[in-house]
Amino acid sequence: MDYHDPYFFGYVLGFIHLLGTGAAIHALLTVRTSQGAIAWAMPLLFIPYFTLLPYLVFGRSSFDAYIKARRQANQEMRIAIGDLNWRPWMEEAVAARRSEAYAALRAMPKLGNMPALANNKVKLLINGEETFGAIFQAIREAKKTILVQFFIIHDDKLGRELQSLLLEKAAEGVAIFVLYDRIGSHALPGAYIDKLRDGGVQIKAFATRGGWLNRFQINFRNHRKIVVVDGLKGYIGGHNVGDEYMGLKPPLAPWRDTHVQVIGPVVACLQESFAEDWFWATRELPPLSLPDEFPEDGVLCQLLTSGPADAQETCSLFFVEAIHAAEERVWITSPYFIPDEAVTAALTLAVLRGVDVRLLLPSRPDHYVVYAASSLYAFDAVRAGVRVFRYEPGFLHQKVVLVDNEITAIGSANLDNRSFRLNFELMLLTVDSDFSSQVESMLTADFNLAREISVQESHETRRLHQLGMRVARLISPIL
């Protein structure tokens, strides 16, 4: 091949543009939203030299082959669970449907394919010390099984404390299963994993698919955080395993996050969620445990799982339904605010209904492009009448929804496109006035430490900053 041929580079450029055109067509056919399709297709058509590789890494969001494989694995898992006659919540589900609180959930049980269950005990854990203090104490008391799932596990002080506890319990004969996300925990060294494995802990990485090409695919991250001990106690929320979640790493310290401890029949749903992801990673079921008895009364709870293999966009629909359900107030906290059109419309309509609509966002960025895009969406929300606050003391990472005086949701889902369509997420919904009152007190304290964004501020942003935010928003559908 003559690289000095004057036509050579023309052929190369033409070939790249041909590939870009093919990728643009693929984006138009497969990306779920029109905004995302356009955000990919235009650059692929006009500047494919810079966008083909990012599309290979970040794009292909529908990823049909993966979705089919995941759905098939989920079906196989349900068949395997059916063979175990695993139906632990029948009485609690009937009791839930008969309760007055059940009507507050409306579409949620069908949306999440998990039943609403009565008779649960829930405890709010409002920082890293409370969360990991409770989790580690439960692990120390474990007798039979421990299920652990996190998006991020670091080999630092907190990570090594978890490792030490798990090795100690494995030596006592407790069956331990650990699942981590391969992308979120990309910095986790092999020595950390090997030490757990050598000590008798079963540990696996959650990955999208096998194959050389899919090594470049970093979408479809498993963002869920689950700990279940002996089928008795479950933990769900926003914390990962790392010193930053304990507020030990400036400049984001102190870290603001929230977890929930739950005891009762909904813990069986947490185990099913873990089993679904574990089955995908191993094609085996972990042991599923039930207590001898459930609490006789307590809180109505529902676990809402969501992911890219769902038949509908479960996470986005959850936020839309929660906002539409609000009659007096809807307060939402999230580290990121990149809503789709449906969520934006729901927030606007809630304001027009006279609902007290508040958003609590961080004042410090952990991802600058996402923060810039979030800022522009926040300004739009303020101009629509939404009260938007920025948490001042440190980084806000909690994912909490409070609707009126009964409904709460706490878990892993952010108010952004990635949680809506790309990540595997998990939220715990509760219907209980006493627990909602606790969440209200927690959020009120957070709002008191926050600065409200004014309409004037949204108009006074410098032109250069506005340009940066608009560029960030342009690519926000693919973030």
Swiss-Prot record:
- Membrane-spanning intervals of the chain: 8-28, 38-58
Provide the protein's localization: Cell inner membrane
The principal location of this protein is: membrane
Q: Which domain of life is it from?
A: Bacteria
User: What's one GO BP annotation on this UniProt entry?
Assistant: cardiolipin biosynthetic process
PLD phosphodiesterase domain span: 218-245, 392-419
Question: What's the catalysed reaction?
Answer: 2 a 1,2-diacyl-sn-glycero-3-phospho-(1'-sn-glycerol) = a cardiolipin + glycerol
- UniProt record similarity statement: Belongs to the phospholipase D family. Cardiolipin synthase subfamily. ClsA sub-subfamily.
List the protein's name: Cardiolipin synthase A
Species per Swiss-Prot/TrEMBL record: Pseudomonas syringae pv. syringae (strain B728a)
